[in-house]
C-alpha cells in the first residue's frame, strides 16, 4: 500500500512545475493524482518547490495543528503553491475545481523515521 509520506507526495507535491495561471490545472491534477475517485476531494493544495525544501519544514517552526496535535511545522519562507477548490454545485463524478496560485508559508504535520511530512495542514499569508 501507500505510506502516509507517499500519500503526501502524491496529493501535495508538484515540484516540476511553477504555479499555473491555467484554469484547467486543478481539474487535470486532481484527476491525475487520484483525488476524484469515488468522491471529489473538496480542497487540496499543491506545492511547487523541491521535495527536500518541503521535507525540511519538519525542522522549522513548530506550531499547533488545526486538530490540536502538536506535530505541525510552519515553513520559514513563503512557497509557491496552487490551491484547488471544488466549485459550487460541482458533483461527482464531474469534479470541477477553481485554481488559485499563491505564495504562502505552508504548515505540514510530520511523523516517522525519517521525520517527513504526512499531512498538509494549512497555508498562511505571513509568519506570525
From Swiss-Prot:
The UniProt record lists the EC number as 4.6.1.18
Q: According to its record, what are the GO cellular component terms?
A: extracellular region
Location(s), subcellular: Secreted
PROSITE patterns assigned to the protein according to its UniProt record, in alphabetical order? RNASE_PANCREATIC
Q: Which CDD domains match?
A: RNase_A_canonical
Where do the record's region annotations for Disordered lie?
Answer: 1-24
Instruction: Write out the entry's keywords from A to Z.
Output: Disulfide bond, Endonuclease, Glycoprotein, Hydrolase, Lyase, Nuclease, Secreted
Q: Which GO terms describe its molecular function?
A: lyase activity; nucleic acid binding; ribonuclease A activity
Q: Which reaction does it catalyse?
A: an [RNA] containing cytidine + H2O = an [RNA]-3'-cytidine-3'-phosphate + a 5'-hydroxy-ribonucleotide-3'-[RNA]; an [RNA] containing uridine + H2O = an [RNA]-3'-uridine-3'-phosphate + a 5'-hydroxy-ribonucleotide-3'-[RNA]
**InterPro entries listed in its UniProt record:** RNaseA, RNaseA-like_dom_sf, RNaseA_AS, RNaseA_domain
Name the predominant localization.
Answer: secreted
Which residues are sugar-modified?
Answer: 34
Listed under GO biological process in this entry are: defense response to Gram-positive bacterium
What are the cysteine partners in each disulfide bond? 26-84, 40-95, 58-110, 65-72
| Nuclease in keyword set | yes
Q: Where does substrate bind?
A: 7, 10, 41-45, 66, 85
Active site at 12, 119
**Tissue and organ distribution:** Pancreas and other tissues and body fluids (indicating it may have other physiological functions besides its role in digestion).
Q: Where is the composition biased (Basic and acidic residues)?
A: 1-13
Subunit details: Monomer. Interacts with and forms tight 1:1 complexes with RNH1. Dimerization of two such complexes may occur. Interaction with RNH1 inhibits this protein.
Family the entry assigns: Belongs to the pancreatic ribonuclease family.
Q: So what does this one do?
A: Endonuclease that catalyzes the cleavage of RNA on the 3' side of pyrimidine nucleotides. Acts on single-stranded and double-stranded RNA.
Q: What is this protein called?
A: Ribonuclease pancreatic
